[in-house]
């Protein structure tokens, strides 16, 4: 009877596994094809009227650029009302935007004709005389998936069509027509809202049933596992309860690793994509889906959106960086605990094994930290991928060790969840691939009792469960369209060019190839190939489990192979290997200790290789992303000690030890075997080199950030922002509290001391300027190109050569403006009023030395909110950096003075300006009032330009002492802002402009990073041609730059702030009213491709 009962239980469990597994597979498999509820959005025009009864314009910037469909009808009688010189009949973008003719629909009338053009391609033309004579009834314009066209109805030859790629961008409807709403005058814009979908009742039910079926199937498989071993449930639970004995070494390593991770959480640099992911998460709830905010025409982030959805929930609590980065730090702690508690014990259990070797445990912690800190302290998915890879490996090993298949099913679920974190999450499949043979053998052994169908059905069902996550609110068609656009827009690099990923690590003066990142990858590769060499040569190492060790090597190697199939090749993706690196570090220390004891030559070669790794790593800069560089030593150069490069020191040591190893090698022919005596001292010497090297690197990284945090305080750093957030209950505003802005630069303009004499050029020119004149300003003030290195994240420039790009803050690149107070025609920057701001410059003076000394200007009383004397200037100006290096140019100094009792002014010292550049564009020279003698109450400009070169000139405006206020006070938390990728995470209180129903809210400000980052990344990644926010900001808005400074850090180019102004004011073109609806669409339905062309 017991035997019959066991067989009956086996049959029931097998039947449950088969039926539930197949049901789960089918139910989950059809999820991508099930119908969803799609929100529709349509704009009808005209909307409202002006006070005199005429139609109004409307503003509606579409996130996708082009609409799904467009249909416009304009009575020819309305067109005939335009004046004789013509005008704008209708357009979908303002005429004054950047290259709007190349993107929009424009119907223009001149004296003779009316022309309909889509993206600068003419579709139809009609003579105005024919229209005025009543030769046509209406102009019909349309654009949809079939094409674009126009028809002057009633005029022979007045119709024309264009291909679908001419579908215009829509930012609203704009017109010069002065007519009222009337029959036949209409426009309909169907917005492409294909990604704004929610699951219907059917899809919800199928997903729920599918998940339940898979869970039941896995329970059935677990029951088969139990029954196949002939134990009762109680025996099974007792037998497989984990027994983990933690020694002192493990506890000490735990404390050190976790303490370092927690410290790094506060003081460590963040990743390059923190702002990207934070902004996407913040706008997702209102957008209705996880939309790509900065690129790709607003497509969904699916199938890699579930992690961003989690971030959106965190952002609903607080957007402070110290809060948002909790998942990364918790993942790091979890990774280490898994390594120390499970992985090391699996690789070397028992006395004398790897897990009981103190140095191996310490080495695992040090190598893990050296691989984790440079990559995984941000919102990027690599920390969770590293955790997912380790969990998958542990589950696969548990399945193999215990002969159970249920852990393998769980491993499949974990691996697929990890794979959908990001494309590089594909490496989570590596443990499954390397363990597949052993699992398949287990299935074959149990075939007689379990059959093949039961385990295979459950494993397949576990694999299919990922469709519920990926397609929970999207469909197969929308995810496919999103992928198409991303591959169309790029950047993508072919799999066979994956070597570029490693090349990026070697590029000099590149943050992506910094010292810490080079070391992490070099150590990973060193450990991988080192252990592989030892195992191939020796076969087995005492204390190391051979099977798990080989599968660890296979997991790492296959993971690196799978990484080649990712479309991007950013070096930061190596962070996904941090957990494996730590484990390999322990195995390397353990195995090399054995071969080191065997031979002095081998031990010396081991040390030589590690010294060479250090030499190669320290040939890179100690650079970190953006704000992470603030106050860090050697952030832009190779580390040096006593003026000697550290890389040269390690290379020299490596050469010396290499020569010593060669001597040991040749000495073997004469002295025989050179085995090292097996005592405690030698065992320590043989096992600690990797530990020492990794500790040096970790100490350098943590020490660099700690030094920046301590020695720069109270100046802004990431550490200061995090500590302030913690002390204020996450309510501080990080960089927005420390960036100071000039709300009105004209208000701070200094006034000349009364009673002074000066020439016809006014007080700024002084008594008799030579060579300086109001018109002495060049028209073209574009700065020199910024050359960025290959491999820069969020840059779509060439991946294999340096890239040059030009960018300047709005209004700083020169040009002509209205006539100023002293006759200058220069266009002034930063909101300076030409009616109150004179200009003097030496441009064009190529015959003699130019000189000018301005009149004395009265300084205001000292106050904390007025710390600077500021001079707006252009051209080439001599200045000194904070480290003492000079920037070549001509001399512009500020001279302090003091007014005596008799009213006479006594000159005091002169100072060069702080000039953050770039030359020759307009910028604000800074003279901290802390530099002024305490008695100084006046100041004047002393200008001298003896260089006759056409490039060596400069221009300047009067000094001002502006009242500064924080950016948080100026912008606040309610104003919509475009925060560039690099800056968004540093301004948690500012609100990113929202997207709703496929329409973008127009921002009022833009926060940019430093000049180089803007040129190399922001302006390329966010461009209109790639579907970024410039798609509508450049078409609908004009910009001006606000003068800003980083509190107390006057030498710092922290970035800039631009203010947006609508080309067509909101009272003339209010935001469109959108009619919303809901339709049901099948999972395979595709309303044509989204236009994703330049």
Swiss-Prot record:
Biological process, per Gene Ontology: Actinobacterium-type cell wall biogenesis; cell wall organization; response to antibiotic
Protein keywords: Antibiotic resistance, Cell membrane, Cell wall biogenesis/degradation, Glycosyltransferase, Membrane, Transferase, Transmembrane, Transmembrane helix
Induction: Positively regulated by the transcriptional regulatory protein EmbR.
Entry's localization field: Cell membrane
Family annotation (InterPro entries): Arabino_trans_C (IPR032731), Arabino_trans_C_2 (IPR042486), Arabino_trans_central (IPR007680), Arabino_trans_N (IPR040920), EmbABC_dom1 (IPR027451)
Phenotype upon changing residue 350 to D: Resistance to EMB
Lineage top rank: taxon: Bacteria
Any one GO molecular-function label of the UniProt entry: arabinosyltransferase activity
Any one GO cellular component localisation term in the record: plasma membrane
Misc. remarks from the entry: This is one of the target of the anti-tuberculosis drug ethambutol [(S,S')-2,2'-(ethylenediimino)di-1-butanol; EMB]. EMB is a first-line drug used to treat tuberculosis. EMB inhibits the transfer of arabinogalactan into the cell wall.
Similarity annotation: Belongs to the emb family.
Protein name listed in UniProt: Probable arabinosyltransferase A
Lineage: Bacteria, Bacillati, Actinomycetota, Actinomycetes, Mycobacteriales
